[in-house]
Amino acid sequence: MSPKIKVIFFDVGNTLLFPNRERIHAPLAERGFVPDAERLRDLECRTKNRFDGIMTGTIPKNGSPDHGFWWMFYSQLLSEIGLDDDAVRDQLVASIRNSGNWDTIRPGTADQLHEIGERYRVAVISNADGKIEDVLLRCGIARCFHTITDSGLVGYEKPHPEIFRQALKSMNAAPEESLYVGDVYSVDYLGATGAGMRAILMDVPGAYRDKGVPRVESLEELQIALGDGESRGAT
């Protein structure tokens, strides 16, 4: 039997907070392009699967450097809408990498985190720019967490095991008693499990529905999973 989960670490982006698309996509709107939610959801799913393939080596890089998930996402979006403008792409990538632009929060998130916090100690591990705590404060959920581990401050990004080790140390938590909740398989799931933790994906757009990996699509589903024999995929 697996040890009981005592600590839950959360990713932030696309797990608890979501991008302010209106602000980030202002350069597109100025040029008459307003991508709808369904297009963006579909592109996120496709980009995650391609990015995971590159990160895990199942898709070759074809000699080109990997510029990161959002570089891939916006390169593809601009290609699909017929806007060939590297400066716009770079502006979009810089904007979405600014943690201050991740301030869209689902209704009920704070209440759900408080409920989870009544049963588990909760913390954050985020690839960010050193300012994610400020954003969590602004969104009203920073006090839900015992510790916040920001890659911009600790010097390591997921999936590097050191960022997970530092977060575990900050919580005095054993990896086998800790669960990580994040949204990208190759970065969050493999990073956490590689550090000895258990993991489950927060798969809001449904990118991993047919991939056979542990996943939920909301904090409500996570609570149900946690109450069902220590979670469907977190064991």
Locate the predicted segments by residue.
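Asp-based, Mg2+/Mn2+-dependent phosphohydrolase catalytic module
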Residues: 1-12, 38, 84-89, 110, ...
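N-terminal helical cap/lid subdomain that shapes the substrate entry/recognition surface
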Residues: 2-110
